[in-house]
Structures are given as C-alpha cells and as structure tokens.
C-alpha cells in the first residue's frame, strides 16, 4: 500500500480553481520532488495533504487514514488529528516558537501532543540535533540562530514526532544563498535513510539528484511526472521543456 494517495483533489480560492482534480501516489520510502512555476499549485497541494488547506472535493489517504474532503471537516476532526500525527511538515518560514529554546521547540509536540515522557523526548531531541549538525544549540533561542540553523531545527522538530511522511514546502526559499547547502544536506541525509518525503522546491539540481520521482505542475495540474533524472534529462511535454530550458542549458 502506498504511503500517500490523493484522488481527484479539487481546491478553489475565491471561486477560482487552483487544483484541478489532482491524483498522486507516493510509495513508502519514496522521495518525490514537486517543481513548477510560482502559482502552479505546488504549495497548495502540499498543504492540502496535511489539511492545512481544505479542498472542495477529493480524498486524501496517509497510511490507513482516509479523509473525504467533500464531507464537512468538522465531522472529521478526530481523523484529521490522527492523520497529522503521521505527517511532518517543514515550512519555508521555519515557524519556530520565538520565546522557546531549540530544545523546547523540539519536545513540545512529542510531550504535549503524543504524551511522551519528557526525559525520553529530551534524549531524542539531542539525537536529532546531532543528526542535523546542531550539537550544543539546545539552549539557544531562534533569534540567535541563522536561517539555515532555524530550518534545521524545524526539520529536527518534524522528525521528533516520528512521522511516516515528511512534507517540505520550499525549505530553502527564505534562506540566504550561502545557507541553502546546509539545509539541503540535512534533507539529502534523510533521503538516504529511505524516508517517505514530498519536497516542493525551486532547487532543480537537488530535485534531480535526490528525488526518486519528479512531478512538474503548472496552472493547478500535473503536466508531467517520472523518474527524476529522466524527467530532467529528457522532458516529454513542451511546457516542461520550456520551464526547464534554462536549467538544461547549464
């Protein structure tokens, strides 16, 4: 069974359709990169999987939990809460609590939401900080960290919930260029662990080299998808070729 399955997903903003019946499957352990121009629906699709956006219709399944978005969301709050416990989400703007330390940011979810014991959550948080290269930053506040360090804390925070799936929404777009590499390296290490991940990104080389599969979206539709290296090397659709033209010429 696939880790994620999206069927016939439709989303509208102010009467305008921004996702036109999207179908998507992600296998367990697969890394999928979603690319495309700004406004193509990439982030909306990602946020819909976690029900941060409420679609008009379609179904979303993560593991064994299925949400029918055509039904009132108020009647499915318990299901949505359970689904979110299986899905980690890394935002482009970090979304760390500014008045809590790095350690407090990471243990909040496991202790408050999942009911884990605090000493165990702290021990795991320290392990995760080591994984993302932030040993010794436990007591730091977000304002004392660079953007790249804050994003790596956000990744550790997502991992602390032991998610089955991790969604990344343009995780490097808010970073200074010299800080991008450290975040991409952290995500690359997770890919090597065969974690199930969906990554919306403008980092084309990263998408080509790290993803198993790439999806190109435009105007709320999936235009083309395929094995990542093949899609970048030889896109089949004219719109995909047009989008990738500058990248392919490098």
Feature-to-residue mapping (PLM):
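ABC family nucleotide-binding domain
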Residues: 2-228
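C-terminal boundary and immediately downstream tail of ABC-type ATPase nucleotide-binding domains
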Residues: 219, 225, 229-250
